[in-house]
């Protein structure tokens, strides 16, 4: 059961981000390789050292946020269909990772990150606790904040949302980022 929860937590965290895109009526097929690029960056740039996590994780977040923003920009501003843009980004990221790694596996993760998957609090793995906290935060953002209402408005009818004063392009870019 522990393994099921750990695997579910990882997929659940990714699904939280995907939820924002789907609510706007979009789709993001690049999420798997976006996650893989992030994992590669953390494992190789941090060099298995907890001390390097201070800059490694923020750098990974900036890079993946930027790649997601590129998806969102091309979809909302350049009007590239979401399935085409995100599938194209998926292929680009896959090729980039194969070129960077030359087909060899990356380094091991820093001990602090390994702790997230191996240790627990009151029998609940740390990663599952993080997933629960992130789920609560996303649910609050969706149902108690303006941002969530904007996402739902765009998903229902982007044209009406635009005429009602919502900056549709910016909101879509942010949802993909």
Where in this protein do the model-derived segments appear?
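Internal alpha-helical transmembrane segments of multi-pass membrane proteins, especially GPCRs
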Residues: 6, 10, 34, 58-59, ...
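Alpha-helical transmembrane segments within multi-pass membrane transporters and channels
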Residues: 50-90
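Helix-loop-helix "hairpin" substructures at the membrane interface of multi-pass membrane proteins
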Residues: 54-60, 66-71, 122-177
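Hydrophobic alpha-helical elements at and bordering transmembrane segments
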Residues: 5, 9, 45, 92, ...
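Transmembrane helix-bundle core of multi-pass membrane transporters
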Residues: 1, 78, 82-145, 171-174
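Membrane-embedded alpha-helical core segments of multi-pass
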Residues: 9, 13-17, 38, 63-70, ...
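Single transmembrane alpha-helix segments in multi-pass membrane proteins
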Residues: 1-49, 73-79
